[in-house]
Every structure is written in structure tokens, then in C-alpha cells.
Amino acid sequence: MAREYKIEDYRNFGIMAHIDAGKTTTTERILYYTGKSHKIGEVHDGAATMDWMEQEQERGITITSAATTTFWKGRDGKMRRFNIIDTPGHVDFTIEVERSLRVLDGAIALLDANAGVEPQTETVWRQAEKYNVPRMIFCNKMDKTGADFYRSVEMIKTRLGATAVVMQLPIGAESEFKGVVDLIEMNALVWRDESLGAQWDVVEIPADMKDKAEEYREKLIETVVEIDEAAMEAYLEGTYPDNDKIRELVRRGTIDVKFHPMFCGTAFKNKGVQPLLDAVVDYLPSPIDIPAIKGIDVKTEGEITRKADDNEPLSMLAFKIMNDPFVGSLTFARIYSGKLEKGTSVMNTVKEKRERVGRMLQMHSNSREDIEEAFAGDIVALAGLKETTTGDTLCDPLKPVILERMEFPEPVIQIAIEPKTKGDQEKMGLALNRLAAEDPSFRVKTDEESGQTIIAGMGELHLDIIVDRMRREFKVEASVGAPQVAYRETITRQHEEDYTHKKQSGGTGQFARVKIVFEPNPEGEDFAFESKIVGGAVPKEYIPGVQKGIESVLSSGPLAGFPMLGVKATLIDGAFHDVDSSVLAFEIASRACFREAAKKAGAQLLEPIMKVEVVTPEDYVGDVIGDLNSRRGQIQGQESRGVAVVINAHVPLANMFKYVDNLRSMSQGRAQYTMLFDHYAPVPSNVAQEIQAKYSGQK
């Protein structure tokens, strides 16, 4: 099967929005107008279109897929292939948001015409900024009371520090909104209400809007000629670019993230969606318009580039794992280079395992389709992968590459969770395991002593969302305990311990003597073991028992029973008995030896230190810094980003609980923060005593 659409005719994009800006409705309308079986502009039987729309309205097209493939005929009459990638609504799910931003090539940022740029819009915008994602803006909900397009344009400049290039002006607002002025063609599009937005009339610009349209067209041209020297010179000499040239310049500036074309409409009332789709074709990049993806060559560890080309070796990134009621576990992957055939084996370079591609699906808005082959630029859902998790690279086994070394930080916060009814116990276990498979930064374990189920994640909000998803998706109601910080323990000085284990009580006895030097591991936080035994003081076959014994007690330190980090143990001497010694005897001896030594080797409590980034308007910088200092935070630096200030700090996790509420009230909801685990550091002694007293009582 040959490629159906050229790669330059692909658009992989997402819709970014504040939770209430109308993302679902806009996506639904896009899927409706681009629906595979009902291309607007082709099957133009109003009645059929109406029926389908009503049916879909009753059922509500819910986009349960992480990526939906659909098609659209551009202004030039040529079909394009769209892959719409779902970007999560929860911005605090940093890992997931950033991953979806990674696999899309461009985005539409939605604004609510009534609210303009809201705090969460700022957050999503800044994340897209970090990945340099080309964006267009759609000012939605123009029919809402209080809708104000021009105020939204102003807020983009003041709140986001971005340049919006206005491409359309609204005709009317609130309940009077009926169409838009196209500033390139200089005509007006007015939608017919009776066709549910499927049809519109191209008319002259209303007389009372002609001056405004001229003014905004002038601004549009002024902005776009700046990116092209020849066009700029011609413009200064009085020669205006023609419409095709304007579009070409808007496209270049958008892809280079110099500015953002802005459109308006109301998805709910079906007005303005088709021109937005034409704009996706005209202004957002295809996979070959953006820099080729870089990866690490598994063999040489050097950096390599994989171009978006079917003839390059296969490379793809698994960006989402979802459970599908019909197919089971589906792995969504973006193919960056090469092509993939059903039934072939691919290499998972992160897990170093081969995977066989069983079924390969293309997801459409209201159907799924089995496909035999997929190409560079495609987004596919793969069934039957056993080892692959989010963030893994799948590639040609002969040309291995790792596209992204996903560093999933260790969870830093944990809470006990239990189902509200005994009958939900099993359902809760299944739900938690599925959620853990989808999100590598979330873990589930059982506390051996209390038998409680413990969930661990990247922060309070992360775990709140998990509990919320359990309720919504798996219908399991759960109660949660208070959050607990994942402390650790270590040793701070060298200590030599000599220990003999003897047991004589009839029958075979036990005997083992070990002499071990314990010290902080200079190599880092892992456990290191070395044997310097010479002359057979401890026979070779017993040495693994010594290591195993120490490892078995590392999970519970001497101060408050927390796992231990950064310990090195060197076995230097020992003794054995021909009859009474065994691997088990040496295991017991080394276990007791370490327990004794840990108390004498300067045991110390460690706490997780978080890397906190706060993005705030300038007015609140003083308050934010003062507050972080009061939380034992250390400010690492600050910089301006657009009209906002970014403050970086290291703060102990124990002092970050409920921070989100404080920050919101301090900044009237305009500042936001992200928090990632950075490192472990010693707990100040006064705080350490409190923690020890609290936890020793529990152990």
C-alpha cells in the first residue's frame, strides 16, 4: 500500500485551552465538519447533514481517543490529512502536557471571548513557548454575553507578551454575532443559521465596518512584511504584497513563532469553524516544516537526526497508553521517520526488548479502522504491545535510536487510599494498576505492616487527579489519608563493624562472622558492595549472602524506618565453620552487622527538595519570594519571560503542601507554578527530631 497523502499535506496539531474555553465543543465541530463520510462542501444535502448532526448531538461525540485522524479540503481544493492530538485539560499534569506538546507540530490556542486570557491560558501558553510550538489563536464564544474580541487581542499582548496578527474581525457580538470579515480577501462571511453552520454567504463588508477593516488589514500587512526584507522594502516604497504573498508571510512567521494569526467565531453556534480549518492548512506546519527530531544513537551514544521521510530508518515515540473497551490496551505512537507494517517486530530501545505489532489502528471521530501500514508523520494506535510504556522509543532493530530519555522522577508524596465500600476493593486494585500503566510518574504499593494501599506521585494535585479519574472512569469511590513525604536516611561517616552470628541449640548450628566497613557511597545514592576477602576467610559461595543480608535491611533505616540511600559496604574479613556455616547464616550476620553499624555511622535524615518554578506577574514578585523563603526555600534566580517573571527556587516538599491555594490568593489566581523533584538533602536537626519522634512512634 503506497502513501495516500504526501507528508507535506499532513497537519499534526492540538487544541490548547483553559478548561472552560470550549475545547470539547470546538473539537467536536472540527470532527463534524471534517467527518470522513460527510465532507462539508461535498455531500451538500442539508437534510443529511442536519440528521447526522442531531444524532451526534444526542450521542455527543466524545473524543475518547488520544489522537483522531480526519480530512479537510483546503482552499485550493486539495485534501489534507489532520491528526488532532488531545492535550490534557489539567495543566498540573506536567509530564503529560509536555509529552503531548512534544508530538504535535502546531496548536490552536482557544480563548473565551468573554474572559480573554485566563490564568490557565497563561500556563498552557508558557509550556507551548518552552517547546517553541507554532500557534494560532481562536477567540471562541463570540455569542456569549460580554464577549469582547478587541479586549482579548489586547490581553494577548499584555498578559502573554505575544503578538497576535488579527486575520478576521467579528461582525456583531453576543447574540448579534453572525459572521466575520476576512482581512486578506476583504470580504465578509455570514453563516446561515438554518444550515447549522454548514453553509455561509460571502458578502460585502458591512458599511459601518469598512474603516475598521482597512485599519486592521494595514496592521496585518505591517506586521508580516517585517519578516521578509524584500517585502519590507517594497512596502516602504508603497507596493503592497498580494494576497498569496500575505498568506506565505503569515505562514513563515507562524512556523518561526514570530507571531500568531488570530481568528474568531463560536463553535457552539457553528460559526467560524471552516475558515479556522482552512487556516490550519494555510499556516500550521507539516512534519517537514519543523526541525527534524534528534535522538541518541544506542551504539555510539552520539546525537543523531531522523528526518521526516519514509526512506529513513523507522523511529517512533509512544506518547500515551489508553484502555479501549474493544481492543484492550492501546499504545499511541507518533512515527517520526520510516514506515511501519503490521505484524513486524520493532525494538523498544528504552526497555531493550523487541515488540511485535499485532494490530494497527487509525482512530477517526466515530469509528476506528484497521490499517496494514503507516508512514512518517502518522499517528497510530498499536494493540498487542506488552513492554512499552509512555515515553518509550520504538524503532528499526538494526538502526536503534532513543528519541527521548524519559527521566521519570521518583514519586515524592504518598497517601494511603481505601475504597469506601468493601465490594470496591478489587475494582480499586484494577483501576490503580491501569492508571499506573498509563502514567509512569505514579506508583502503587501495599504497606507491609499495615496492609494499606499506598499511592505515590509528583504532588498533591497529581494524586487528586488520580483519585478523581478513578471515580469518573472506573466508578470507584475512595477515601484518602493525609499526604506523607517520602523521607530517606543515609550515613555520614565511615564505620567498621565486626559481628559474629552463632546459634547452637541442638541439631545443626549456625555460624558466620563478618567484618565490614560501611561508608557514604561516593558514587551517588545507590547501594554499592565490594568484597576484599583474601585467603578464603569467607568462602566465595557465601559472599552473595553477605550482600543480600545488607540489602534486605536498607529498606528501613535506624532513625525512623525510612529507606536508606548512598551506602557503600566493603567486606574485609570474616570466619566460617565447616559444618555450621551457610549462605543463610552469613545473610543473618551481615543484616545484624549493618543494623549495629548504621547507628554508629552518623545516620542522617534526608528530605526531598523540589525544584519549584513560579511564573508570576511583576506586581507579586516580592510576595512570592517572601513566601518561598518562609517555606525554607532557597531562591536560585529569576528572569523575565514576556510580561511575567519566572522565579526558580529549591524548596523542601514538606513545606509545599497547600501551596497552590496560597499562591492563588497571593496573586489573585494569576501566578502559577510547576514543581519537580530535584534532589535529597539533609533535614535541619530541629525538624529531624520532630520527624523522628512522629515516625518512630508509628514503626
Swiss-Prot record:
SMART domains noted in UniProt: EFG_C (SM00838), EFG_IV (SM00889)
GO molecular function, one term: translation elongation factor activity
Pfam family name, one: GTP_EFTU
InterPro entries assigned: EF-G-like_DII, EFG_II, EFG_III, EFG_III/V, EFG_IV, EFG_V, EFG_V-like, G_TR_CS
Binding site for GTP: 17-24, 86-90, 140-143
Record carries keyword GTP-binding: yes
GO cellular component terms, A-Z: cytoplasm
An example Gene Ontology biological process: ribosome disassembly
Main location: cytoplasm
Domain tr-type G: 8-288
The entry's keywords: Cytoplasm, Elongation factor, GTP-binding, Nucleotide-binding, Protein biosynthesis
Coiled-coil parts of chain: none
CDD domains: EF-G, EFG_III, EFG_mtEFG1_IV, EFG_mtEFG_C, EFG_mtEFG_II
Highest taxon of source: Bacteria
Protein location: Cytoplasm
Family stated for the protein in its record: Belongs to the TRAFAC class translation factor GTPase superfamily. Classic translation factor GTPase family. EF-G/EF-2 subfamily.
Function: Catalyzes the GTP-dependent ribosomal translocation step during translation elongation. During this step, the ribosome changes from the pre-translocational (PRE) to the post-translocational (POST) state as the newly formed A-site-bound peptidyl-tRNA and P-site-bound deacylated tRNA move to the P and E sites, respectively. Catalyzes the coordinated movement of the two tRNA molecules, the mRNA and conformational changes in the ribosome.
Protein name: Elongation factor G
Organism: Sinorhizobium fredii (strain NBRC 101917 / NGR234)
